[in-house]
Amino acid sequence: MNFIDYDFIEIGTSDFDTLIQGSEDQFGISIEPVKYYLDRLPNRKNVKKLHCAVSFDDIERDANVYYLKEEDIIANKLPDWLRGCNSLNKYHYQHEQLNIKSIVSVEGVKEIPLAKILVNNNVRRIKKLKIDTEGGDCFILKNLKRYLKTKSNIFYPKEIIFESNELSDPNLVNSTIKEYEALGYKLRYSDGYNTCMDFKKPEKLK
């Protein structure tokens, strides 16, 4: 197999603050379940744009994604950050909090385990793994850990950054950090918004 070393993989992009937007010659994969937002991201020659959701429970299935289109946000004078408030198989809590379920768009999407995405795209090294899935980040990382434990540590992402805000269970965040520290990661920061960890062990091919 011809493995590919990636500069980044980002899971859950919306259409702002993305790695693909700042990428020029980098190799990457940008994964987003909302096609409306994925299509608004720039096309880069070395970056794959994948329209799917990364499964929280490692099961492949058909699903629905709940989101707001930008024109509906503007027409209803809603805050712009709602572009990033999307949810799998249910309304986002902001949709309910703001009483805007009537303008939420719902579309079908495929949920795919992260390990399958990595294998299908011949992924080996990953310099940066960025996850922002509105509450599912720790579940994805726990699934990823099982995959990584079957590989040499050359497959371990060098940097992992994931969302750890009010949508995240603090106990789950802490247990995820501890599990990755056991793999050789060192916590750089966890500030109530995001958590960042760096892999510190020397690479081993086997």
Task: Locate predicted features.
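Conserved beta-strand signature within the Rossmann-like core of class I S-adenosyl-L-methionine
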Residues: 154-164
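Structural motif
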Residues: 7-9, 29, 125-128, 159
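A short acidic, amphipathic alpha-helical/loop segment
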Residues: 18-24, 40, 140-147, 175-179
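Short internal loop-to-helix segment that lines adenine-nucleotide cofactor pockets
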Residues: 1-6, 87-151, 168-171
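SAM cofactor-binding core of SAM-dependent methyltransferases
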Residues: 1-69, 164-166
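Short, flexible/disordered intra-domain loops and linkers
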Residues: 77-78, 167-173
